[in-house]
């Protein structure tokens, strides 16, 4: 029986995995690892050195998912792929090269603590048990069926390093017991319970910052989660950095404010609850490792000193969010949602303000009326000033793609590229609105952010200029990401709701489909169905969409960094004809129905008669929302009929205001 394996491995758990495969009689055709980062403290075993000793071919490509590497791996005819602490996700085409399956060893008891740095996170969260899991690899990270698990107790004395050693030993034990059965096909697979899943992103040195307002128990867990060989928990003391390597919890805080030094021997600091005794640490990155009392002396601390940033009751600075296009459909709803949290200052610019009038009196909302193509100095200053930038300005109505293609390109690509470059210049996080249009005529059943092809029509079909402008900017942002830009791309799928457009926009043909259909009902003109109205879309309620976007802005645990996220409702798929029929049903039942003319019927129209010869439509557009579920813990909840009802009601009330205005003018 052939048991040929290709292995993706790093860390000394990667070494343990390779040793276990060899001991179980597997043939290792090749190993893929990472080159060590000279800026990283490599306290763990070297996979490359182990392979050199064992005479195993080893590679460290920048991208193992590149088609050339996939082709080379396929030629090895592996029965299995194994991933042991390899840091990159393996693509579906790569996973498919293994005839008997691909398997990953993860450092937690899945489905809990999916994602990065699970050994650190379980300590941060104060868990008393973790473990290792061998599971089948699928497209979604850490989501495949479980093959085997081994539990590991977490002692109060454990640090990230000691826990890592326990996990390494547990991994060796689990693989020793499981790999022979896997080779014989005698394994049982258990699907993961998604209701119990949790996901955590990567950790950085900045995550070790100590907030003395927190309970001492939380800070104790933080200290042991990031102590040596990691960068350590830290806070500022005057002009110095205090790095805490070990600590203990002491009951009570003597009624002192958080951050106040209760005593220097032992070095005891008051916390939001109880107090923390610092038993060892150092002053600054190049300082000596010292015990608590000597450390206090080095830092000039005395009883009653208050550590910087620890003033009692001091609230953290609100995150500054810059929304360009704040008066638009997404911009005004997102502003309202962020302001509800009271942890954001929202700065906005747009050429109008009708949709945000309800927000202008809010003390945390700051608006300037202006054009992004003119107010470049104001924009650059506010990008430099703010923490998060959302460039929402775009022409996003289909008729403009064929009527004004160059204007679409100038605004949607050229002007937005300037904004992205400012974000690069000032190292600011950008959340960029891509679009479901980038998928074009993709034939996948569900459009996937990471694997679906982006397919558009010929050059003479001008309608694709919007799609390719957005796609090109997506690619530019992705390339800047490789150079350090912090970004998230989100792709809305047919969001609908109040304030989507204006009826006046529909009168000149420059609106979304539902607004045009409502205008037909309001004015008693036939509802035009282009090319039969059989094109299907997945309609998403604005409340659902904004909730997902707000979670991207929150970016808990940095989970959205460098990600592309579809935001849509695959369960709300309907044709444009079905949309029109549901609109009509609700229109006829609406209390304001009597104020409008009789229904004039449906009329089939060729799309080119309205959009022009450069138009080309798409038959279906359904998102995969796996990334949104995994990263944001989000799913849409609003049914399409409710969304249609809310949208219809908004526009009918707008129409009633128009009727009242006309009556006033006629009475003069």
Curated annotation (Swiss-Prot):
EC numbers on record: 2.1.2.13, 1.1.1.305
Family recorded in the similarity comment: In the N-terminal section; belongs to the Fmt family. UDP-L-Ara4N formyltransferase subfamily.
Pathway participation: Nucleotide-sugar biosynthesis; UDP-4-deoxy-4-formamido-beta-L-arabinose biosynthesis; UDP-4-deoxy-4-formamido-beta-L-arabinose from UDP-alpha-D-glucuronate: step 1/3; Nucleotide-sugar biosynthesis; UDP-4-deoxy-4-formamido-beta-L-arabinose biosynthesis; UDP-4-deoxy-4-formamido-beta-L-arabinose from UDP-alpha-D-glucuronate: step 3/3; Bacterial outer membrane biogenesis; lipopolysaccharide biosynthesis
Site annotation Transition state stabilizer: residues: 104
GO CC, one annotated term: membrane
Pfam family, one: Formyl_trans_C
Classification of source organism: Bacteria, Pseudomonadati, Pseudomonadota, Gammaproteobacteria, Pseudomonadales
Subunit (UniProt): Homohexamer, formed by a dimer of trimers.
One GO MF term attached to the UniProt entry: UDP-glucuronate dehydrogenase activity
Known function: Bifunctional enzyme that catalyzes the oxidative decarboxylation of UDP-glucuronic acid (UDP-GlcUA) to UDP-4-keto-arabinose (UDP-Ara4O) and the addition of a formyl group to UDP-4-amino-4-deoxy-L-arabinose (UDP-L-Ara4N) to form UDP-L-4-formamido-arabinose (UDP-L-Ara4FN). The modified arabinose is attached to lipid A and is required for resistance to polymyxin and cationic antimicrobial peptides.
Name of the featured protein: Bifunctional polymyxin resistance protein ArnA
SUPFAM superfamilies, per the entry: FMT C-terminal domain-like, Formyltransferase, NAD(P)-binding Rossmann-fold domains
